[in-house]
């Protein structure tokens, strides 16, 4: 796609007024830095905005508002790469058909773009499934990360690395989101995890382990557990019993796979997505001892 000649004239800032109060709600902002760290305004620091009916003949009261019987829409955080540059990403994500709540550019600056309000449904996940739930657009926040993705082919991939300054932005932003919505570690996923075979992003070079160790974001296995499980690897990887157990373990962790005892396309795609996430040095769709042990270790930690 030729992006030359694209000119972005303005980026508008929207200020929202509470419909039922006289106070002006400050715009949702991502402020600047302390010690080279992106600082994000907390959701709880802003006045609560209420959407409710306005009737001419009746008064809708808030005398008993809010009920305690409620929870957040957001249960998942989904990370993507755009596969295009920042300027084109902003253009694509603000037009029809596709969007995300946030865009993290690839500039060494202190800016993150908010594109869709967190209370709204962004169109980023598409056909997706995680933990038995379909259509994750309804229940997730999506972060698009500017990254050119695979510049090679499927047979000879050449994925684009992520610079540290960009991961700092992603880490701080994701940390803020999961804290506010109490998102479980195993519900911080990549697009590849929720749409195996259809989407590869954020790819094998995305530093999931760094996100976990430096920011407490997402899930990661304990090395000790991995090494405990590895000697238990049964080696008979062609056995329907073994394959069914692998499928059961993948499903338990969150992947949408059958339990038919066959390494079919759906199962292999899920294994590749899993390996990209947790063992990116080799993502061939083969359940070797390390892949098997990592899967066991993750379920021991998060799904006992």
What label would you give each PLM region?
Residues 1-10:
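Bacterial N-terminal signal peptides that target proteins for export
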Residues 18-19:
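C-terminal motif of bacterial Sec signal peptides marking the signal peptidase cleavage site
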Residues 30-184:
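Active-site-adjacent loop/helix surface patches within enzyme catalytic domains
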Residues 65, 89-90, 129-132, 154-165, ...:
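Second-shell loop/turn segments in exported
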Residues 73, 97, 157-168, 202, ...:
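Soluble non-cytosolic domains of exported or imported proteins
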Residues 103-104, 204-229:
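Acidic, His- and aromatic-enriched active-site or binding-groove loops in soluble protein domains
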Residues 183-198:
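Acidic/histidine-rich, metal-coordinating catalytic segments
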Residues 234-298, 304:
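Short acidic, glycine/serine/threonine-rich helix-capping segments at coil-helix boundaries
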């Amino acid at each position: 796609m030729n992006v030359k000649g694209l000119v972005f004239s303005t980026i508008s800032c929207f200020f929202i007024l509470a419909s039922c109060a006289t106070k002006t709600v400050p715009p949702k902002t991502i402020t600047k830095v302390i010690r080279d760290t992106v600082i994000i305004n907390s959701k709880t620091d802003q006045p609560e905005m209420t959407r409710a009916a306005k009737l001419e003949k009746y008064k809708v009261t808030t005398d008993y508002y809010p009920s305690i019987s409620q929870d957040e829409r957001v249960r998942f955080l989904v990370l993507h790469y755009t596969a295009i540059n920042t300027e084109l990403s902003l253009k694509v994500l603000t037009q029809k058909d596709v969007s995300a709540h946030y865009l993290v550019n690839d500039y060494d600056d202190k800016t993150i773009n908010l594109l869709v309000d967190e209370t709204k449904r962004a169109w980023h996940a598409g056909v997706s499934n995680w933990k038995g739930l379909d259509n994750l657009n309804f229940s997730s926040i999506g972060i698009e990360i500017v990254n050119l993705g695979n510049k090679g082919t499927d047979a000879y991939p050449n994925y684009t690395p992520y610079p540290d300054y960009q991961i700092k932005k992603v880490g701080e932003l994701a940390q803020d989101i999961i804290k506010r919505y109490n998102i479980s570690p195993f519900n911080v996923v990549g697009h590849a995890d929720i749409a195996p075979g259809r989407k590869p992003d954020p790819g094998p070079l995305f530093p999931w382990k760094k996100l976990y160790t430096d920011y407490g974001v997402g899930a990661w296995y304990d090395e000790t557990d991995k090494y405990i499980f590895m000697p238990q690897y049964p080696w008979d990887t062609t056995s329907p019993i073994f394959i069914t157990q692998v499928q059961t373990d993948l499903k338990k962790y969150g992947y949408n796979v059958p339990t038919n005892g066959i390494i079919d396309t759906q199962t292999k795609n899920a294994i590749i997505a899993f390996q990209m996430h947790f063992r990116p040095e080799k993502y061939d769709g083969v359940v070797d001892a390390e892949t098997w042990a990592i899967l066991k270790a993750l379920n021991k930690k998060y799904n006992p």
